[in-house]
Regions:
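C-terminal transmembrane beta-barrel domains of outer membrane proteins
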Residues: 213-386
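Transmembrane beta-barrel strands of outer-membrane/channel proteins
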Residues: 5, 29-33, 60-66, 102-106, ...
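Feature captures outer-membrane beta-barrel proteins of Gram-negative bacteria and organelles
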Residues: 18, 44-54, 83-95, 102-104, ...
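Outer-membrane beta-barrel domain signature
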Residues: 33-39, 72-78, 114-120, 160-168, ...
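Residues that define the transmembrane beta-barrel architecture of outer-membrane proteins
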Residues: 12, 40-44, 81-85, 123-127, ...
Length: 386
């Protein structure tokens, strides 16, 4: 993208000229070790987007995920602990920013390790249809509104007896309305809030489960409401130090099925525990981070950081086997590395993150679910986008 100014036709007028090159293909390759020990620790994700091949602003994105080993990508049976893939398509409706999107994905998890003998397997299919509209687009702030209809079908089964037997079966249809803001009036503010409601259409109710395969939670319902929020505020202190504070959560009075529960674990939440280690119907989390950028070469920067995070997840209407409340807090240090280059004749941005943390969690969850690399408490994240 290149810009320049040229003289206008009227006296004193100026015309902004923008020259851009169309990028037909874009995408990325990602690796991290945020999965549980039972799922093999490592996860690889490959994504490719075809940008406006016809010329109407449409895009088609395809992705796949698996454990990044030969057996993980090509194997079968117990060699495959996690695998998934999907595609999404978006198309602009008119010239006012309204955009329609359609997506579909499938995933499978087959935990190994100490519970491999149970033969547990989970298969999920999901799809969505949505509209997004920019309420306000300015150089210093953006507001966007979205509405989506989501559908999820998840079956958990076991073959411990030698025969595939369903343990639970959830099928949910949800209507979601979301609002997103990003702006930098003084510091930068981001928040995304979403209201969800369960619908009867194509959903599986508790009454259906009484005569067949049960739901994932006996107290869970497909008729629910919940409000979800993720936000952050970042600003510079003493000129060179960036402070970022993240806060969010989910609120509901209903007992939710597994797929609608939220988690306090994530890169911008508590990053020291494996994905999905702590989830609940109601949650809250807060994370603070202090970092500083150092430019090593022209296109290479490193950003050491310190962080502290905590969160709590609550279960509504818990059974005797469920925990009513789980909490965790962690503190650690890490470094982000960012490099842009055009080696091998294509532009790409390579980022990496290494993080060491100390975690304290309810019921010794940190012993079972902390992120590890080569038996050491280290989180590793690698990404190349092109």
């Amino acid at each position: 993208l290149n810009t320049a100014f040229t003289a206008g036709s009227s006296e004193g007028a100026t015309i902004l000229v923008v020259e851009a090159k169309h990028k037909l293909l874009s995408g990325g390759v990602q690796f991290n070790n945020t999965q549980s020990e039972e799922l093999g620790r490592q996860l690889g994700i490959l994504q490719t987007t075809i940008n406006s091949p016809i010329g109407f602003g449409e895009s088609l994105t395809m992705f796949g995920l698996a454990r990044p080993t030969i057996k993980g990508m090509k194997g079968t049976g117990n060699d495959v602990s996690i695998r998934g893939g999907g595609l999404s398509f978006s198309y602009p409706l008119g010239d006012n920013g309204l955009k329609a999107s359609l997506s579909y994905s499938e995933s499978m998890t087959r935990p190994g390790g100490d519970i491999a003998s149970l033969g547990i397997e989970s298969n999920m299919k999901s799809g969505s249809l949505g509209l997004t509209y920019p309420l306000r687009l300015r150089a210093d702030s953006t507001w966007s509104l979205r509405g989506t209809i989501n559908w999820i079908d998840e079956i958990q089964q076991t073959n411990a007896s030698g025969i595939d037997t369903d343990i639970s079966h959830d099928r949910l249809t949800s209507l979601r309305l979301g609002l997103t803001y990003f702006g930098c009036p003084r510091g930068c503010i981001y928040f995304d809030t979403e209201l969800s409601r369960g619908l009867d259409i194509a959903s599986r109710s508790a009454s259906e489960a009484t005569t067949g395969t049960p739901l994932s939670r006996t107290s869970g319902t497909s008729h629910y409401h919940h409000l979800r929020l993720n936000s952050s505020y970042s600003f510079y202190a003493l000129m060179d130090y960036l402070i970022k504070i993240g806060f969010g959560g989910q609120y509901t009075n209903d007992g939710l099925l597994n797929s609608e529960q939220s988690t306090i674990i994530g890169m911008d939440k508590i990053s020291a525990l494996t994905s999905g280690a702590i989830s609940g119907d109601k949650i809250w989390y807060i994370r603070g981070e202090l970092s500083r950028n150092f430019s090593i070469f022209k296109n290479l920067t490193i950003s050491p950081y310190l962080y502290s995070a905590m969160g709590v997840a609550y279960t509504n209407k818990p059974t005797a086997a469920e925990s009513k409340e789980n909490a965790a807090k962690s503190a650690g240090l890490g470094v982000n590395i960012n490099n842009f280059n055009d080696y091998f004749y294509f532009d790409k941005n390579i980022t990496a993150k290494v993080e060491y943390s100390k975690t304290i969690a309810t019921d010794k969850i940190e012993i079972l679910s902390d992120v590890r690399l080569n038996k050491h408490h280290l989180m590793l994240f690698l990404n190349m986008s092109f």
